[in-house]
C-alpha cells in the first residue's frame, strides 16, 4: 500500500524500483503474474487485465476511460531481470514495513483473517473503518491470497492505551470476519494472539471438542500449551516484551 511505497522510496535498495515502475502516488499497487504456455497468451492476459481495470473504474462514469489512458495504470514488465526487482521488493514487504521510524509499528494479530472472496472488498473497507475508529491505520502488504489480504495496524506496544486498542480492534475485526463466515486465522494459525477467541469464532460445541481431543492426545498439556485451548488473554501483559510502565 501507500505506506510501504513511501517507506521503500527511503531505502536505497528499493528506491529505484519504485521510481521506475510506480506511477504517481497510488493508494496501493497489486502485482499480477502470468505464467501461460506461450508469451502471446501472457500478453492476452495482460490485455484482459487492462480491460477489467477499465471496467471496474468506469462503473457509473460516462466518459471513455480507456481513451483517456486509465488502462495505462497497468504497468507491463516483461524482462525477467526487471520482474526479479519487483519480486525482491515484494518479498521484502514486511521488512520494509518494520523500518517505520516511530515507536508505533505494524503489529500482527488480525493480519491473515480470510473471508469468502465475494465479501473481500466489503471486509477490507470495514476493517479500515475499524482502524480509523481507534485512531490508527492498517499497513497492507505481502501476497494477496484467496479471500485474504495481509494487514497490520500500526500500534505502540509500549503504550497501555495502544494495547487496549489492540484488543478492541481484534474484537471488532473478528466479529466482522464472523459476519462474513470467514476465518480469523486464514494462514498463520491461532497462536497466542487468537486462541482466546476460538469459542466465539467456532462456537462452544466445537471448542469443547477441541478441549476433549487435547486431553486425549496430550493429557499433561506438554505440547505447545496455551494454544487453541486453555489460552491466555491475548493482551496479558506478562506475555509482552514491554511491561506496563516501560520507559527508555
Give each language-model segment a name.
Residues 1-143, 147-186, 190-248:
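Noncatalytic alpha-helical scaffold of FAD-dependent oxidoreductases
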